[in-house]
Amino acid sequence: MNLKAVLTSVLFLSALYAQSQHGEINMAMGLKEVSEHDSSKKYKNVGDFFKKGEFEGHGRYFFMATDNSKGLSDFYANAFGMGIGYSMPRFHGFSVSMSGFFIYDLGSSDLTANDPLTGQRNRYEIGLFDVQNPNNHHDLDRLEDLNINYKYKGLDLKFGKQHINTVFINPQDGRMRPTLVEGLTASFSPGKKLTLYGGLLFGASPRSTVKWFQIGKSVGIYPEGLSADGTPAEYAEQVKSRWLNYAGLEYKPKENIRLFLWNQVFDNVNNTFMFQPEWIIKKRKFEILLASQFIRQQTIGEGGNSEVSLRYAEVGSYVNIFGGRFEFRKSKRWSVQLNYTNIGNTGRFLMPREWGRDPFFTFMPRERNEGYGDMKAINLILALQHKKLPLTARFGAGRYDLPDAKNAALNKYGFPSYYHFISELRFKPKGFIEGLEFFFLMVNKIGFGEDYNNPRFVYNKVDLSNFNLIVQYSF
């Protein structure tokens, strides 16, 4: 074991001891905030000051396996990782936070091997490690948080490397570690009804990587798909963008009404706007949630590059997206959702998959609807909560009608239309082992669109089953 691993283990055990009296912390979603109490009292010494800070830790085991259709390659992976974080005590509103994480491969398929029939690489399991270096199994470590935070009344500012959870940039926590960003983020709540959000980002460390990248260079790390003319996209390391900014507004004029506005500008690439109103109808024994969603995206500047072959987005392109949700909630025991999404046919919806999952109501694990135009989707989600046990379940079924798999102008990844099914179980015990969590996910996708008897339109896309087991402990 190298020195880095030894030091990490020592720090982890120290954190466990120091935090034996603290509550549950989920490192997968970022550092726990230190107390908002502004402690300006005098400390005995520097050591006493640091002892007043908060340690936290997270350990995760992840098993994943994919069973493709007959004749195509199957894969499995076992990953284990641990991390620690520390936040200094708040002083005159300021606090400094830092965290890191390392991952080990406990035994997996050869994730560097291409499928013999299609020549394509592994899609899902490689994401547990480093997609840029699939041969690296034992030295996967990443600095995650390193930031300074300031809080005053309803204002919250954070600058540096940090976790983030916004509409289009979010943890997408379906692998070992989430997507992280570098820059300035802010939120301000002048009252109980209104919250304002803003951010200026210039760097990112996408999920399934161990490095940090300038914001433009973080695009194209994952498979690039096809350009609108059907040729292989070549925008990796070619997106010329200096920054990304976002601004949002959440307004609750009444307890049962929520209005959400969001606008994101990706310098020299595109502008994406979202409006989402929600209305809750409360009755004595049940609730009904009605929500709609409108998204408009349009290319700005050069679409990422002045050379057509290196662009991320087509100049002059735009697309409108509409969505709706009906949700029936029966107490806290169960709920059912009916969701719908319609992406217009004027162009593709493009949002780097490296940054997070799409915000559509019809999102389901292990697939995205990014990269498509002229798409219609509908799904039904049932959520259940056990009456006595800390056990929840979620089941879903959806239909996703996509453009023809050969229509690259509206189908970036050459995907046939498909049915999507999910089954989830989550168990979070209480008492002595509180902080421990078990999660199981099974996904099935069945293609019904034309695949032209071409296995490249099938492999790791449709006619597959994907299995996931996660055991994690947070403190």
Task: Tell me what each language-model feature is.
Residues 106-110, 197-244, 286-359, 442-462:
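Outer-membrane beta-barrel translocator/channel fold
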Residues 54-55, 92-96, 154-158, 193-196, ...:
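Repeated loop/turn-to-beta-strand initiation elements of outer-membrane beta-barrel proteins
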Residues 23, 461-475:
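Outer-membrane beta-barrel "beta-signal"
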Residues 51, 74-80, 140-144, 151, ...:
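Residues that define the transmembrane beta-barrel architecture of outer-membrane proteins
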Residues 87-118, 135-214, 251, 257, ...:
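Outer membrane beta-barrel
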Residues 57, 82-88, 146-150, 184-190, ...:
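Residues on the lipid-exposed face of transmembrane beta-strands in outer-membrane beta-barrel proteins
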Residues 61-65, 100-106, 152-154, 161-166, ...:
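Transmembrane beta-strands of outer-membrane beta-barrel pores
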